[in-house]
């Protein structure tokens, strides 16, 4: 299966190379994506590099360092190509007649030019230029492993150490392993508190985990840490009588990460979180910190996706970069 997918990927690369128009434009890979726009509930065809622009602008703050923006551009492009049915991908899970959608909970966020104008206001021209430079500087670059685009995962802030994919998604990848991510303390949401009344938290937990038996009165003693991952995140907890995955607990209470502790505060319970997101793959805050220390985008990507290669998809074919 993998050999067939690899052959399909290489053939498509060669086809795109031969049919691409002779222009110096960065937005000219030749690949068109079928994109499902969740807000408009419609399908649109977009050139790959135009899609990368909108995905980068939606997924990472435009005022991040240029090298961090380049990392996100490569990540967005790799995700799109990996999913593209033209390259043997499976397309969008929720919209199988499309390559990718604009719902960040499913594929990747995306914003149109009109949305960016409304969001950025008077800073539109400056911020748009920053995004455009990152896309053009990485034009055609993908992250690959074994000759195929990798499964790209990223998040806002790891809290100082990324997570192994197997601990979150039960699917191990040699390039999605836990690595140190220093310098993230400057991220605005590095530490955060989320507070609930015990009654509210108990109701949410009972709805998600029927039969666990928690009540507002017993909540503080009914939640007990059972195990942690290698990076220090919550792997499993006991919620009343049930063992619950940290990721499921986080989703139930909309916590910022599985890197959390908790304490009772009268008739309330407070969760203290570190970092933001699932913690797997590229930490955007970590990329920003590494860029501030002088690392270029290739070094940053090699750190967060160890063992992968930067591979160029361009008019001359498919080759290591």
List where the protein language model places each region.
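Conserved, single-site charged/polar hotspot
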Residues: 1-321
